[in-house]
Curated annotation (Swiss-Prot):
GBP repeat boundaries on the chain: 226-275, 276-325, 326-375, 376-425, 426-474, 475-524, 525-574, 575-624, 625-674, 675-724, 725-774
Cellular component GO terms held in the UniProt record: cell surface; extracellular region; host cell cytoplasm
Entry note about domains: The PEXEL motif is involved in the protein translocation through the parasitophorous vacuole membrane and into the host erythrocyte cytoplasm.
UniProt keyword Magnesium present: no
Protein name, entry field: Glycophorin-binding protein 130
Described purpose of this protein according to its UniProt entry: Involved in merozoite invasion of host erythrocytes.
Length: 774
């Protein structure tokens, strides 16, 4: 028992010893490895330092060699120039000697005089040689000193070198002025050759100062737009800065104004005097695409902003929880996406915005100081058009393009019109027929047209279902039809008059409804045919045709009598036909019945109480000025009939959807997509609360648009030139308003914000909204 225990003890001791040795050996091995690593690291650092030192030495040597070589080249250059100047001086001396010898030979007639002159010339030559030797030695000494100084000073005194050389040349000139004029010329040429380098150095900072001045000008406090109240001046400056802009601007301008003098000639020679070839929009667009593919890109961008038909929107609209189509009614979001895709677009949009808004404060000062206070040229597009014609005959083609788009008068239609039994203009005044042809050519077109139609009329059948099921019944504030339905319930008389007006605008004959149900295609074909509706109205009421034609003439100014007057007038620019008020006055004289019907239509639009009719008849001036003054009418109606305001507000809400309850509901709504930026009338209400003066200025703006100043009518009759200046001159009106009320500008900007929805707060609210689409 004991032995076994001892053996056990021994065995355990041996094992412990082995374990101890193994642990020590592992420790020593780790220490050795760490030491080796330290040695390697130190060697690596040492070698890297050596390499860095070697490269540094090489760099310093190369740099010194470069500097010395540069200095040596400069010294050689100056030595070469010095030797060249000396050689040129010797050449001039030799030439002078030859010329003096020739002159002396010609002048001396006798030998005695010749011998004396030779002696004199020898003496002079000796003197000149001595002077030359002295001047050469002085030149060498001075140039050597200059070269030494230049080498010691270095590159920083390049400009001083030119000055020293100039001083040397000037001293030589003073010494050699008496007999060496040609030598002075060569010296001057040499100095001029040296001057450009110094001048270049001095000119470099001047260019930078010019650029700095331009930066300062751009960073000036008045950044609004420098001649934005002078669109033509703005356009001219834009032309200078961006010639590409002129092409696009001219296209758009031609599209808007459509007043080529050649058209006037064609109109006179045509059999039908009412303007023939003003024509086929879509076909014209296709031809424009073929001739200028760049045009399509810009047109599509502008079209997207107006109609908001981005295909991505369509996808988002279908996936959205709220099916009311809010992204497509967000032009600002569309614009932002366009900016991201094409930053060049923003520049052109801003230029166009400046031309439209004309808000340069400097222009205001210039306008007041001008002799002619009406500022006619900038508000005289016809004069501008005439100048454009002279500068660019291509103008006509592009102008006709857009005019054809708006009026749909395809030349082929003109042929069909002449051959038709009914000469009343069937297809050319039938844009829906044009649409049907477009459907056949491009089925994609129909989808986009329907989307745009839904946005305007809010007639999505799904919306109707959602509206009925919704807890909040006021979702129809962006639904004018729902508003109309509520009005029908309150006032059945209203429905009759509204339906008449609605039929004229939308052509929704109940017979069409029957045809629509029976048609294979349920998407409403005949109700989108206003001309067919008009033809049926003609059959039912021939009186209607006469009045409709009169109203059409007032809008389009196509009275055949005007055509005769235009030919006989001394001024061929034709302003009587663009004078609808004069046209109305002539219509009154020819047909007093017309006035009654026109007043009915006017009442529907402006809510003119029949009691006003009595007041109008008793008025001293029988021309009906108050009816052409809606704001004055509204003010008088408010005083006489407070009930009037309610009806006017109802009609206003239908058009603009500005129920005050909507504002509250919008804030409480879960869907934050439409806060206040898509609600211009809510903006108006807030403006009223903050600034009651706003209403007055809004009325001023309305007068400018409609030109219904009673004084204008008097001035028009008394004016020598019958072109109707003041009434067709809204800018002159603006000038008078500015003189009377400088506060006007501020309020005009408010109105601009309402139209464009550019409140900075809206942008912040939009970004913070849960749904970031609008």
């Amino acid at each position: 028992m004991r032995l076994s225990k001892v053996s056990d003890i021994k065995s355990t001791g041996v094992s412990n010893y082995k374990n101890f040795n193994s642990k020590n050996s592992s420790k020593y091995s780790l220490m050795e490895v760490s030491k080796k690593n330290e040695k390697k690291n130190s060697l690596g650092a040492f070698h890297s330092k050596k390499i860095l030192l070697i490269f540094g030495i090489i760099y310093v040597v190369l740099l010194n060699a470069y500097i010395c070589g540069d200095k040596y080249e400069k010294a050689v250059d100056y030595g070469f120039r010095e030797s060249r100047i000396l050689a040129e001086g010797e050449d001039t001396c030799a030439r002078k000697e030859k010329t003096t010898l020739r002159k002396s030979k010609q002048k001396t007639s006798t030998r005695t005089v010749a011998t004396q002159t030779k002696k004199d010339e020898e003496n002079k030559s000796v003197v000149t040689e001595e002077q030359k030797v002295e001047s050469d030695s002085e030149k060498q000494k001075r140039t050597k000193k200059v070269v030494k100084k230049q080498i010691n000073i270095g590159d920083t005194e390049n400009q001083k070198e030119g000055k020293n050389v100039k001083k040397v040349i000037k001293k030589e000139k003073k010494k050699e002025e008496s007999g060496k004029p040609e030598e002075n010329k060569h010296a001057n040429e040499a100095s001029k050759k040296k001057e450009p380098k110094a001048s270049k150095v001095s000119q470099k900072p001047s260019t930078s100062t010019r650029s700095n001045n331009e930066v300062k000008i751009r960073a000036a406090s008045n950044q609004e737009t420098l001649t934005s109240a002078d669109p033509e001046g703005q356009i001219m400056r834009e032309y200078a800065a961006d010639p590409e802009y002129r092409k696009h601007l001219e296209i758009f301008y031609k599209i808007l104004t459509n007043t080529d003098p050649n058209d006037e000639v064609e109109r006179r020679n045509a059999d039908n005097k009412e303007d023939l070839t003003s024509a086929d929009p879509e076909g014209q667009i296709m031809r424009e695409y073929a001739s200028d593919p760049e045009y399509r890109k810009h047109l599509e961008i502008f079209y997207k902003i107006l109609t908001n038909t981005d295909p991505n929107d369509d996808v988002e609209r279908r996936n959205a929880d709220n099916k009311e189509d809010l992204t497509s009614a967000d032009p600002e979001g569309q614009i932002m996406r366009e900016y991201a895709a094409d930053p060049e677009y923003r520049k052109h949009l801003e230029v166009f915005h400046k031309i439209l808004t004309n808000t340069d404060p400097n222009d205001e000062v210039e306008r007041r100081n001008a002799d002619n206070k009406e500022d006619l040229t900038s508000a005289d597009p016809e004069g501008q058009i005439m100048r454009e014609y002279a500068a660019d005959p291509e103008y006509r083609k592009h102008l006709e393009i857009f005019h054809k788009i708006l009026t749909n008068t395809d030349p082929n239609d003109e042929v069909e019109r002449r051959n038709a039994d009914n000469k009343e203009d069937l297809t050319s005044a039938d844009p829906e027929g044009q649409i049907m042809r477009e459907y056949a050519a491009d089925p994609e077109y129909r989808k986009h047209l329907e989307v745009f139609h839904k946005i305007l009329t809010n007639t999505d059948p799904n919306d109707e279902v959602e509206r009925r099921n919704a807890d909040n019944k006021e979702l129809t504030s962006s639904d004018p039809e729902g508003q109309i339905m509520r009005e029908y319930a309150a006032d059945p008389e209203y429905r009759k008059h509204l339906e008449i007006f609605h039929k004229i605008l939308t052509n929704t004959d109940p017979n069409d409804e029957v045809e629509r149900r029976n048609a294979d295609n349920k998407e409403d074909l005949t109700s989108a045919d206003p001309e067919g509706q008009i033809m049926r109205e003609y059959a039912a009421d021939p009186e209607y045709r006469k009045h409709l034609e009169i109203f059409y003439k007032i809008l389009t100014n196509t009275d055949p009598n005007d055509e005769v007057e235009r030919r006989n007038a001394d001024n061929k620019e034709e302003l009587t036909s663009s004078d609808p008020e004069g046209q109305i006055m002539r219509e009154y004289a020819a047909d007093p019945e017309y006035r009654k019907h026109l007043e009915i239509f006017h009442k529907i639009l402006t809510n003119t109480d029949p009691n006003d009719e009595v007041e109008r008849r008793n008025a001293d001036n029988k021309e009906d000025l108050t009816s052409a003054d809606p704001e004055g009418q509204i003010m008088r109606e408010y005083a006489a009939d407070p009930e009037y305001r309610k009806h006017l507000e109802i009609f206003y809400k239908i058009l603009t959807n500005t129920d005050p309850n909507d504002e509250v509901e919008r804030r409480n709504a879960d869907n934050k997509e439409d806060l206040t930026s898509a609600d211009p009338e809510g903006q108006i209400m807030r403006e009223y609360a903050s600034d009651p003066e706003y209403r007055k200025h809004l009325e001023i703006f309305y007068k400018i648009l409609t030109n219904t100043d009673p004084n204008d009518d008097v001035e028009r009759r008394n004016a020598d030139n019958k072109e109707d200046l003041t009434s067709a001159d809204p800018e002159g009106q603006i000038m008078r308003e500015y003189a009377a009320d400088p506060e006007y500008r501020k309020h005009l900007e408010i109105f601009h914000k309402i139209l464009t929805n550019t409140d900075p707060n809206d942008e912040v609210e939009r970004q913070n909204a849960d749904n970031n689409e609008a």
